[in-house]
């Protein structure tokens, strides 16, 4: 069995209770790794969103991520030019000033026309798109309209990808134990066979306003990151598929891909580490999550 780095001690969430650990979990922070953050359902413009943004900026002091993936509902309510300022630019001002790039996907509350044309979302007018960083390729999808053209595109894009890591993200979760929405089964029927066929490693979604990590399904680890602004406290309904969850406070995630390992942490608005682990990409693109 692959040995964990001795400097890493993880915290895990069981029944929404934060379990104590001896030390604070750390990331390897290797110079040649891909480092990014994950946020979703954040664009409220309310104090909790600003506090999450502050925690992200603080985390970056020791974990210098250069990109943030956004899993939708990037802005709620009106989405005028001034709303992009109060619900995006101001909450993440230190990150934007440091040159951190944000890559958005569309949620059901997003104004697609406004989002697609907003330069700091880096969508370049495309509802779905992909981009690469070192050995990782990211695929952003529009789960609001999973039409045949988009399905054909993701099938082809995944088939043609030779990258070691394939990470997909979009708004509606294929798996979720959130009480408000739960899994998007019709979307899962369409996308999961494609993901399995072409070796997708990890999928990030939102929509349910909780943090959740699902036990690997057909070799894929699914995360719900829907509480970076909005929150439905106590909304998780744990099942046999639940690996970890946190629904007592807003949260965001930090991820580092280093070779065949993907280290991840979920952090709360208060700065607590509420989940963490390592996903190891093994032979034949099979993965193993520790723990």
Locate each region found by the language model.
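Active-site glycine-centered loops adjacent to acidic/histidine catalytic or metal-binding residues
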Residues: 41, 72-73, 107-108, 171, ...
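Secondary-structure transition/turn motif
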Residues: 43, 141-144, 224, 265-272, ...
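Bacterial N-terminal signal peptides
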Residues: 6-17
């Amino acid at each position: 069995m692959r040995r964990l780095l001795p400097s890493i001690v993880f915290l895990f969430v069981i029944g929404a209770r934060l379990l104590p650990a001896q030390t604070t979990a750390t990331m390897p922070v290797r110079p040649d790794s891909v480092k990014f953050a994950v946020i979703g359902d954040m664009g409220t413009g309310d104090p909790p969103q600003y506090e999450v943004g502050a925690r992200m900026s603080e985390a970056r002091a020791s974990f210098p991520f250069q990109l943030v993936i956004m899993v939708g509902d990037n802005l709620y309510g009106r989405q005028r030019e001034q709303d992009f300022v109060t619900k995006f630019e101001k909450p993440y001002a230190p990150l934007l000033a440091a040159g951190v790039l944000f890559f958005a996907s569309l949620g059901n509350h997003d104004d697609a026309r406004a989002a697609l044309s907003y330069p700091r979302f880096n969508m370049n007018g495309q509802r779905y798109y992909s981009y690469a960083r070192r050995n990782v390729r990211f695929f952003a999808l529009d789960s609001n309209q999973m039409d045949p053209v988009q399905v054909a595109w993701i099938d082809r894009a995944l088939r043609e990808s030779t990258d070691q890591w394939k990470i997909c993200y979009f708004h509606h979760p294929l798996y979720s134990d959130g009480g408000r929405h739960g899994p998007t089964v019709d979307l899962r029927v369409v996308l999961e066979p494609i993901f399995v066929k072409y070796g997708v490693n990890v999928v990030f979604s939102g929509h349910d306003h909780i943090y959740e990590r699902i036990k690997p399904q057909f070799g894929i680890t699914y995360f719900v990151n829907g509480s970076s602004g909005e929150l439905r406290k106590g909304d998780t309904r744990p099942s046999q598929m639940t690996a970890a969850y946190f629904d007592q406070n807003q949260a965001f995630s930090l991820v580092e891909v280093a070779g065949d390992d993907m280290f991840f942490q979920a952090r709360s608005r208060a700065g607590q580490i509420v989940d963490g682990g390592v996903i190891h990409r093994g032979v034949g693109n099979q993965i193993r999550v520790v723990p």
